[in-house]
């Protein structure tokens, strides 16, 4: 049988097999080779016959027939004429599908510039020719001539001449003495004339010679593009088009609408304009029209082609009939609706349905309820085939009829088909991978999908009208993956933090909490029971109560597996809970012999999962769900108004606070404190009062009273709900029954007057009005932040999508150090929690005995973590994604444990995407959750340090003075207090704030919880180091200092004002000096005068002539007033960190260790230099704006990395000064802090994976003898490759320094141009890729989705691996054969080779 006929039944041609895709500029010859004919007419179809016009935009001769196997005039019809070209209408008889593939072309009468290479910044044509875009446009749009060949005239090469100048030059020098041209032809000639090799040599020489930085950068840019053209095989003149390709007609269709009108693609309009203008230009040229007319027509042609390629990039946007801009070729690719994001990365799928979800409490964890109607529709093909197999129908048509009639046998078959065939459920928005899970369907009546209550947390679903989509995996492989990887029973742990996500919530928690309550004095207290039957009998007959304290004999096994029985003090409810616990010696009854809150239950599930495995966990979860629901229903807990108990002491607390606030008001009136300080203190006092009232209320609500018989009363219902974690929080209870507290303005500032009422008492009108502020802000925030958070997730996924586990071990010796994170004296993240599931980088030794506890390259399990905390180790070095040395992807050892499975991570796990989802998902969650506390102000300021351990104090860099009041005061910024225990190990170190009051001294013994130091968080002091008398310098009334008299009190306070703006104030340097008895300025012990510089807004605390002692305060600088912290500030903060933006007031960090010296001021900046300790370093200078407070004095000693001026440090500075490890620690801690404030747990490794992706580039400092250009940014991998090459050739290698890129920039600079183009700035990415002739190796996930393959992660990774091995073996076999052939010229059949074993 003929191959063509075979193709009839299998029309899909075999897919091309390719490993890489290359993009480059199309040459005119290339465009012609694609084309099937030239389009000469702008017509589309004939208005009477509706057939395409010949040589028009839809011409059948060029593009192929309209109907399958039928020519246009109808002479040849049917298959048998396949391949014949009709002599009447010249149409080939073939499939009409070719109209989607065949291209045409338009021959342009005059060349035009390709707008992408002209206008997409930086202009490629401009860079190559070294001309500005303005000049290029003047030439292209026929305003100026350009001299190509000056000849012997005085004109210069590439000089621009206007019309008059051109004519004058012709008159002056004669017509043929020089060559000048205009329009795209001129540019084409210039580009053609470039000799790239010579140009490259010239540029390199020029770069060596130049001194100026700016010029060097400019030359580097040009050199880069010249090299790109040289190596890619593109010719510069191809950026000027002489032929325009026309895309196939079925990709720009003309669709008939009812009513005889047509809807057309915008491209047809754009092509029509090009053809019209081109034809007109041809005609004008034939007619030898005047130059000016031809020029105008050429300009219009250029504009038409520009609009076709990228409408609106230059000049006005071309609009259609309805004033809507026409969609050009570039718009087809760009944006959310473009080809990349709409059709290649996101496709609509068949076999799917959606419906509302309802709760299905009787389902098992792996099941979902699917409405029969839906299932029938979704599984239709399977039902047809089964009907056919059973002989119930002979044709598909018959089967269809049976199904439509819903005959009884169809339902039986549906049951069979559905059995063990998982379906996927998805709830939008799918923020992380748990948003799509597989379930086994059970058929139900009705039209709503039933969902298991425990998976709601993963989907973030509730039943207030949410909808979910169902998808059917069709192929066997898909079903297998759904069952093995995506089944809800396989997703028990959260990929972000490794804690269980199948956790009971709401009613279930309440029921379990109620079940585990123990109350005193109930009937039957102290009775002893031997087994469950006795217990149930006693319960039912009312001898004991569910909450009675009893003794019960519990059977369990000891360490050796021997059964033992022990008597346990417990309650009947807890025993019932114990019955569902899996039997294992690792899990004791004590796990549940306590009050079960949500957190406790989560802990138990975690234990069960770790010790008993997945199956047991799933059964356990289902059982406690049933138990919880049943007991919540039995308990009948309700919510009454008397359950909201307003504490007795409330008004007393309110009155004292009111008095305090009044007192602060008075102090302000007396001029003792500033307005800012008063505000801070008042806000502070009220937030303390709110806390106090909340505490009182909690105390009253949580206590249970006993009646005359000693029977303990039932616990308060509201307290039960909040305490168990079922619903509500202490913050909400506080607003119900305590006092609502402080409210925030939309700007984030706190309103000074709090809301004293609570919701039970009711708010006054004024209070209500005040509270609307915060509530409205919350709602507005929610709407805005959801979009922001989604965009953050998208950027994160894009930057990390090609991060995949590709090997087991990269063998690196590098790692990062981990220690516990302590904030305000409390441990917020213990060392154990941070290193769990990570790999040890070096042997971990016991500090006391020096024996090896854990060997290097061990994956830390829970047991190892316990060992470490027992040994009191404070710091552990672990492997990290940041230090992994693999070229592509990350190795399993550096990544550690797969958090969602609790086992070492598998090959092919897409850890980048998981990291991105783990960071992005809570962003959206939190933004949706801002308004829950109604904007009630949550203020947190740290101002004390307390010891966490018992031990002895040692102080490093000690400088303490006893001030005039007899207190000890810290006099330096780098003073560190350490607590050392009896063994001499440092248990904790605290950095002490400048000016803090010390409560301890060197060698003191402290107890746990004892205060070490405290300070005022709202002001920063300027202290004196010497005893003496005060003198002022440059503190001139009205110029640099303003004395404000408080009218009501008559007390003056003096503030330093901005002196730069005042007349004659530019040279002032306001300062306080300390004078000795002789009236001269004293010298400081470390050299320099005792002169203390003041910054703007400093408040003076002393007068001229006052006597001071060391440690006394000379002036105070107020820090900004307390703003509420809320993830609203948090999300932008996370984005700012990931984008590696420089903060507004960036801190200035010392690059070297040395001594501070003040230099001469420069304009209105202070000059500070650091004289290095190390003689080989050079002195560093910093210019600091005058108003900034510099808290260093002349002669202070700073360490490398110390802050000279406070603020948020710029991440780039940290990288440059302290290196990668410090930068990673900074970013991880800052990002974690934002999430921690909201109580969200994210494992550090996710953030590390993203930071690794931000550090992929190297900036070249010295190019050595390589082809790299100093100053350019290049991929680390490429950098290493070129250096290796240079080393092998014995040349000098290049040196570079790592650079930090923000996630957007990093995404746009990935090695794959497909991935970058589908992310943002499509035009720019594609232009650059084409110029460079880039090759996309198709390594990441996105590129493979775009070209329609399996992604190289998960099962796709193993397929890729197998393919790789196969290719290697084939190559080996071929090499062997070639060798054999070379040895034996004409040997008989050689014996079969021994193949290498398959991996």
Curated annotation (Swiss-Prot):
Pfam families associated with the record: RNA_pol_Rpb1_1, RNA_pol_Rpb1_2, RNA_pol_Rpb1_3, RNA_pol_Rpb1_4, RNA_pol_Rpb1_5
Q: Which residues bind Zn(2+) 2?
A: 810, 884, 891, 894
A biological process (GO) of this protein is: DNA-templated transcription
- Quick check: keyword Transcription regulation in the entry? no
What sort of enzyme, by top EC class, is this?
transferase
GO cellular component terms given for this protein:
DNA-directed RNA polymerase complex
Q: Which family does it belong to?
A: Belongs to the RNA polymerase beta' chain family.
The protein's annotated catalytic reaction(s) are: RNA(n) + a ribonucleoside 5'-triphosphate = RNA(n+1) + diphosphate
| Molecular function in Gene Ontology | DNA binding; DNA-directed RNA polymerase activity; magnesium ion binding; zinc ion binding
Provide the protein name.
DNA-directed RNA polymerase subunit beta'
Co-factor remark = Binds 1 Mg(2+) ion per subunit.
Q: What keywords sit in the KW lines? A: DNA-directed RNA polymerase, Magnesium, Metal-binding, Nucleotidyltransferase, Transcription, Transferase, Zinc
The yes or no answer to whether the keyword Nucleotidyltransferase is present is yes
Q: Which domain of life is it from?
A: Bacteria
How the protein assembles, per its UniProt entry? The RNAP catalytic core consists of 2 alpha, 1 beta, 1 beta' and 1 omega subunit. When a sigma factor is associated with the core the holoenzyme is formed, which can initiate transcription.
The UniProt annotation places Zn(2+) 1 binding at 71, 73, 86, 89
Record: residues binding Mg(2+): 462, 464, 466
